[in-house]
Amino acid sequence: MRLAVFSDVHSNHLALEACFQEAERQKADVWIFLGDYVSDCAYPHKTMELLYEAKKEHDCRFVKGNREEYILDHHKNGSDWNYQSTTGSLLYTYENMTADDLKFIDALPITDVIRLPGHDAIRICHGAPYKTRVLLEPGNGMAARVLHEVEEPVLLGGHSHKPFTERLENKLYVNPGSVGAQTCGVAQSEMAFLESDSKSWVPQLVRVPYDNAAVVREIEESGLLYKSSVWAPAIAKQLVTGENLALSCLLRAEKLAEGGAVTDTHLKQAARELGVLQERIHRYGYDYCDTQ
């Protein structure tokens, strides 16, 4: 029995296609999806179409992530999202999803349990079983804490974009990393496999190459690059460096704000300092320079 695990796609449909090919090559019996399917990259409906196709052809299990929660909250309650701002990328994502896409993500749970005959039960979630935005990272102690709280021997989660495994006594936590927006310095898609010939599961973390440059070109040709202020340019550069530039911009902007509200001006200054808005990356098809 072999399971394929995908998380944090972030609308990177080309990376997801590459991971699907790897899952098919390894003949995975069950495909598990841990949320954050959309936002950040262009054409979110293309990612949703891949999920629908996978659901038809394979035994798939899904939970929602925090990005799906953002989209659904905007859909149901409205928000002050605007283009040319820190929320422009989310607004682009929402406006490029269909009614069926919204219905699909709305129906997803935030946690589920996979029970396969003769094998240890597996709990799946995005961050933690009780909240999508709980951050489990290597060394921060949260994986052990959440493992202690769940009944199942295996817990699968994403959100941190950091692939790792952790054991607590007879329990196992696996984070497959990010399919679509890597942060560990290697610009290749990340996923995981779990394999078992008996009762217990053995994890394997995998990196899968994909056409990064094509994804960056899509961010530009779709108009997303110019609709989201700092965020989309940071993601575009992150896709070719594997470094968490979007988060770095936010953290630097918080310091510039000196305890006050972070404004778009702070974010743009942070992005310039980090080379996100000023660098021209011709060889990757990314040619964006802020002039304001």
Protein language model features and the residues they cover:
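Glycine-rich phosphate-binding loop signature in dinucleotide/nucleotide-binding domains
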Residues: 23-27, 57, 116-118, 149-151, ...
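Core catalytic region of metal-dependent phosphoesterases/phosphodiesterases
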Residues: 2-102
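Short beta-strand scaffold segments in enzyme catalytic cores
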Residues: 111-114, 163-167, 190-194
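Acidic, His/Gly-rich catalytic cores of divalent-metal-dependent hydrolytic chemistry
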Residues: 170-176, 180-292
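Beta-strand-turn-beta hairpins that frame and shape the catalytic cleft
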Residues: 1-4, 113-123, 168-172, 200-202
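Active-site metal-binding loops of divalent metal-dependent hydrolases
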Residues: 7-9, 35-38, 66-68, 127-128, ...
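Anionic-ligand binding region
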Residues: 143-153, 160-166, 171-176
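Active-site-proximal segments of metal-dependent phosphoesterases and phosphodiesterases across multiple
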Residues: 81-84, 119-150
